[in-house]
C-alpha cells in the first residue's frame, strides 16, 4: 500500500 503519497498510485 504505497498510498502514503498525495494520492499518487501508478
UniProtKB/Swiss-Prot annotation:
Tissue specificity as recorded in UniProt: Expressed by the venom gland.
Name the record gives this protein: Toxin To39
Compartmental location: Secreted
Keywords: Secreted, Toxin
GO MF term list: toxin activity
GO cellular component terms given for this protein: extracellular region
Lineage top rank: taxon: Eukaryota
Cystine residue pairs: none
